[in-house]
């Protein structure tokens, strides 16, 4: 192979690696943003429960829509056996 062909192949490989790495970064960033949104909703829910004595149905339904279940956060810490 001539040097120009080696350079072109190296450039293509570098571009493919960059695309894969940035795809992984974007996926992880979206996960972090989703987790922050869930954490904010849970914090608001806890704050409202402390203030009013009951939980807000709107925020619980928003968490359920996102796939977050409320309940025991640590399944190994259950005292109702």
Swiss-Prot record:
The keyword Nucleotide-binding does not apply. Residues 1-6 are extracellular. It comes from the Viruses. One of its GO terms (molecular function) is CD4 receptor binding. SUPFAM superfamilies: HIV-1 VPU cytoplasmic domain (SSF57647). Phosphorylated by host CK2. This phosphorylation is necessary for interaction with human BTRC and degradation of CD4. The modification Phosphoserine is found at residues 52, 56. Keywords: AIDS, Apoptosis, Host membrane, Host-virus interaction, Inhibition of host innate immune response by virus, Inhibition of host tetherin by virus, Ion channel, Ion transport, Membrane, Phosphoprotein, Transmembrane, Transmembrane helix, Transport, Viral immunoevasion. It is a single-pass type I membrane protein. GO terms for cellular component: host cell membrane; membrane. The chain crosses the membrane at residues 7-27. Gene3D superfamilies: HIV-1 VPU cytoplasmic domain. InterPro entries: Vpu, Vpu_cyt_dom_sf. Residues 28-81 are cytoplasmic. Disulfide bonds: none annotated. One of its GO terms (biological process) is symbiont-mediated suppression of host type I interferon-mediated signaling pathway. Pfam families: Vpu. It is found in: Host membrane. Its main location: host cell. Ion channel activity is inhibited by hexamethylene amiloride in vitro. Belongs to the HIV-1 VPU protein family. The N-terminus and transmembrane domains are required for self-oligomerization and proper virion budding, whereas the cytoplasmic domain is required for CD4 degradation. The cytoplasmic domain is composed of 2 amphipathic alpha helix that form a U-shape. Enhances virion budding by targeting host CD4 and Tetherin/BST2 to proteasome degradation. Degradation of CD4 prevents any unwanted premature interactions between viral Env and its host receptor CD4 in the endoplasmic reticulum. Degradation of antiretroviral protein Tetherin/BST2 is important for virion budding, as BST2 tethers new viral particles to the host cell membrane. Mechanistically, Vpu bridges either CD4 or BST2 to BTRC, a substrate recognition subunit of the Skp1/Cullin/F-box protein E3 ubiquitin ligase, induces their ubiquitination and subsequent proteasomal degradation. HIV-1 lineages are divided in three main groups, M (for Major), O (for Outlier), and N (for New, or Non-M, Non-O). The vast majority of strains found worldwide belong to the group M. Group O seems to be endemic to and largely confined to Cameroon and neighboring countries in West Central Africa, where these viruses represent a small minority of HIV-1 strains. The group N is represented by a limited number of isolates from Cameroonian persons. The group M is further subdivided in 9 clades or subtypes (A to D, F to H, J and K). This is Protein Vpu. It comes from Human immunodeficiency virus type 1 group M subtype B (isolate BH10) (HIV-1). The gene is vpu.
